[in-house]
Amino acid sequence: IDRFDESAILIGGRRNERLVGSLRILCREPEEEWEHDRFWSWRDEFPPRRSTVDVSRLCLEWDERRIQSVVCLLRAVGYVMLELRRRFILACCTDELVGMYSTFLGARFTGDVILHEDLGAKPHRMFFVDLDQILGGRGPSLLGWLEHVRLLRRVLCATMKSEFGMRYRTVLCSYLLRAQQRG
């Protein structure tokens, strides 16, 4: 827990009523401090801050570390980004996860490596993901993930703080219900 949690959108994944994974979305104004600002500088060639969310603290229980669990959490990120009208994800990962994020999300790595003391001693690589490319069929297919909404509904539990958070909990539930009714 840190100073960013108060304004964060927290996403949790459950299996059989047990929390097995979580992540955090920060939707900040360009002039506000972002979590990753402490470790590197935003450059002109990066996507605009106004169009980006900062996703961090993705954590899964050891026995849940499989692609289905990650996909369920990232589906929720996609839903939130659509509601927020943000196109890009800014995130970081260890070397072991570079292939997964490249393959399944079309992650574009910046070449920057940071040491984030809150995330342990391993170096983390910074990357962006373009949701518009995924939804537009010009990258990995998020639509394939969205076909599994029943699984998502069972596994996903959005846990958010404050009045701001309650609004987005309702948004996530609304997306899930609408998708289920169409499916």
Go through each PLM region and give its residues.
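Short loop/turn motifs at secondary-structure junctions and domain boundaries
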Residues: I1-D5
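Short loop/turn microsegments at loop-to-beta-strand junctions
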Residues: S7-I9
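Conserved beta-strand in the GNAT
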Residues: G12, E17-R28
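Short, acidic Gly/Pro/Ser/Thr-rich loop/turn segments
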Residues: V20, P30-E32, I134-G136
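Acyl-donor binding region in acyl/amide transferases
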Residues: E33-Q133
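Charge-rich, low-complexity intrinsically disordered segments
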Residues: A121-G183
